[in-house]
Amino acid sequence: AITLEGRWYLQQQEVSKHISTDKPVFAAAGLGLFVGDAKLAVDAVFATTHGYGGEDGNLQGLCMLARLPLCGCDTVSSALGMHKHQASVVFESEHIPTVPTLVLAKEQVQDGPFDQLLVQSQSKLGPDLFVKPENCGSSVGVSTLAKSNLQSFQDAVKLAGLYSERVLVQQLIHPLLEVETAVLQTFDRGLVVAGPGLVVDPAKENVGYLSYAHKYGQVDAAHIRVPSGLEKSIELSILEYARKAFLAIKADGYARIDFFVSGDRIYLNE
């Protein structure tokens, strides 16, 4: 188990609401993981921890330094995947379409001027905006602004700024379908791309943007529908973009790659 402070503890139960702290775990560079003087027998590590420290390259780097066999993406590709703007720059260099975006620096997030930033955002992206942290996941700190005004814009930027130094202001795509793909790397370094699967949200009886609550907090949670029901040409384009994106950020092992579809337009989201 990993505490919010980043401390590791060996657990006796597979699943528990409470963390037992009597057996702290330490990583030794080049040697592995230890509880006291006892080395833990680790066959492989699946870095499935969400958010900061877990999927941003930090945990991956620790595993590599401790010489623990790591499944999935390494430090570089994990960091790129978490930092949305950096990833989009790489994707665009490979002619993969992404959502039109304006990046707000730390100073702008803190001090504005928000009236000028709103005018700039609406001029570039339109009246409806989507605001999110630049390096976060699970829809944390995200706001949708239909017909955005100064107060709602400032509130959204400040909220996203709680989770990231930089904030992304994006064009709010609508109508919108959200689809997901999965990429698996084979032993001979080939790629198998599965999907796309259509995200269905029964709570709202529609298909679209997945909030944090819909992902984790509801009984009738969103689910994936396969086959997606999209036109074959759209599906084939999505699968090809997913393959190119995986290679572009030097991903390894496996990855989930998400897209937005609006009419015949495709956007790689994350």
Please give the residue ranges for each predicted region.
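ATP-binding N-terminal substructure of ATP-dependent carboxylate-amine bond-forming enzymes
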Residues: A1-V76, L80-Q86, L104-L117
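Conserved metal-phosphate-binding beta-hairpin within the catalytic cores
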Residues: F246-E270
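Active-site nucleotide/adenylate-binding loops and adjacent lid/helix of ATP-dependent enzymes
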Residues: V35, K39, A79-L176, T186-D188, ...
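Phosphate-binding site of ATP-dependent enzymes
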Residues: L150-E240, V261, I266-Y267
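Glycine-rich phosphate/pyrophosphate-binding beta-alpha loops
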Residues: H50-G51, S139, D201-E205
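Short beta-strands and strand-loop turn motifs
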Residues: L70-D74, P100-V103, P133, E270
